[in-house]
Amino acid sequence: MVLLAAAVCTKAGKAIVSRQFVEMTRTRIEGLLAAFPKLMNTGKQHTFVETESVRYVYQPMEKLYMVLITTKNSNILEDLETLRLFSRVIPEYCRALEENEISEHCFDLIFAFDEIVALGYRENVNLAQIRTFTEMDSHEEKVFRAVRETQEREAKAEMRRKAKELQQARRDAERQGKKAPGFGGFGSSAVSGGSTAAMITETIIETDKPKVAPAPARPSGPSKALKLGAKGKEVDNFVDKLKSEGETIMSSNMGKRTSEAAKVHAPPINMESVHMKIEEKITLTCGRDGGLQNMELHGMIMLRISDDKFGRIRLHVENEDKKGVQLQTHPNVDKKLFTAESLIGLKNPEKSFPVNSDVGVLKWRLQTTEESFIPLTINCWPSESGNGCDVNIEYELQEDNLELNDVVITIPLPSGVGAPVIGEIDGEYRHDSRRNTLEWCLPVIDAKNKSGSLEFSIPGQPNDFFPVQVSFISKKNYCNIQVTKVTQVDGNSPVRFSTETTFLVDKYEIL
């Protein structure tokens, strides 16, 4: 390793925040930092000092020091460049270079330090990239949360309005001298009076409890007042109304059954002591009249070793990609070995891969505007008619080796015009009246089911049906890059391994 640790300390050598990039005890790092001020010679303008075992590269920051602890054979020029990047990171997270401010943002600084250095070597990143990586901002997550909060507020407002209506109906019945309606189904006898709003809420929450037959109600003559039976017809009507507006309502039992079913149908991943995760994400933008505006695909092989006896291994990579993908290995991986023999191994074969942590050993990137590279083409043809628009949408799988699962093609609809009239359709559809979208759902698209169409009619203009968005997931990667064999460095004996492949969408739009 080259870089052992990075720390912010006081002029007395007290550690405020420290990140070790090799295995090192707390006593050891505190001892190194405590010895640091005693080694400095204030009469000389040096930015580093050395001992018999390590080198300190440092930069004063008002009353503090930014210190890098490296091995003595490290490149001092690279260390100084890395030190400058560390020093620029700290003001990004701390308003003042003071001990209290550094301590308050210690975790933010540690996360940023990890983006700069991996396995003791500096990553090729700049300040803007570090900020982006540490924020992990997701626009889709913000939109989802905002929509969810809006739905919850609307549902609560509707519940309050319905409760007021029921309370008013009960008061009207009492004024007319008739018995107020009771509530049954919560015990051996009916419960009358009380807060109507509370009873409605309790009815929805307690749908998973076993129902007991209500006691027969005494006849009280004909009444025009609103009646609530043991089965909660008003509640059922209200829930049906929410469902018709696109809200998903399910009882606790149903939710549990769905969760259990998901667990049963989820394919188990048999993880060996050596496990590879191959993940690809695609970002694609097409024009509505044809033509690929941009397609970018990022892939990575993540290695996870759970048994330290398999730490010194090599991965045999089979690259059958013919699309011109750009490959890049981790800085600690022997690039010459990979180029010559398609083997992924550490530069120092005596070293071991980290245990119980995901390590990215190989990544690739593909960027193109070639239409033949589009994995799934979508054609949307809206044509104006006398009553609005007739929309025809077609899909076609261009990569026959792919199998796309859980495909959802989302088409925006004009607001305030009602539900679309569906003609012919391959698969299923969902109409979301709240979001004004039509979701075309296809469980599988593969070589046996590579094309399909959807036709519907709705009032609107052709521009109302764009952008069309697509989402899917696949267990086969787009770029045909696989790990075919894993062997140990000593003896070249084979090692059992498992692989998990995922190809998913980051953004897929037809504008």
UniProtKB/Swiss-Prot annotation:
Compartments it resides in: Cytoplasm; Golgi apparatus membrane; Cytoplasmic vesicle, COPI-coated vesicle membrane
GO biological process, one term: establishment of localization in cell
Protein name: Coatomer subunit delta
Residues recorded as bearing N6-acetyllysine in the entry: 233, 241, 309, 351
Compositionally skewed regions (Basic and acidic residues) per UniProt: 168-177
Cellular compartments per GO CC: COPI vesicle coat; COPI-coated vesicle; endoplasmic reticulum; Golgi apparatus; Golgi membrane
Signal peptide bounds: none
Similarity comment text for this entry: Belongs to the adaptor complexes medium subunit family. Delta-COP subfamily.
Region (Disordered) location: 168-188
Function, as annotated: The coatomer is a cytosolic protein complex that binds to dilysine motifs and reversibly associates with Golgi non-clathrin-coated vesicles, which further mediate biosynthetic protein transport from the ER, via the Golgi up to the trans Golgi network. Coatomer complex is required for budding from Golgi membranes, and is essential for the retrograde Golgi-to-ER transport of dilysine-tagged proteins.
Domain MHD: 271-511
Assembly behavior: Oligomeric complex that consists of at least the alpha, beta, beta', gamma, delta, epsilon and zeta subunits.
Keyword match Cytoplasm: yes
Membrane topology value: Peripheral membrane protein
ATP-binding as UniProt keyword: no
Pfam family, one: Adap_comp_sub
Species of origin: Rattus norvegicus
InterPro entries xref list: AP2_Mu_C_sf (IPR036168), AP_mu_sigma_su (IPR022775), Coatomer_dsu (IPR027059), Longin-like_dom_sf (IPR011012), MHD (IPR028565)
Primary localization: cytoplasm
Residues with PTM Phosphoserine: 223, 244, 493
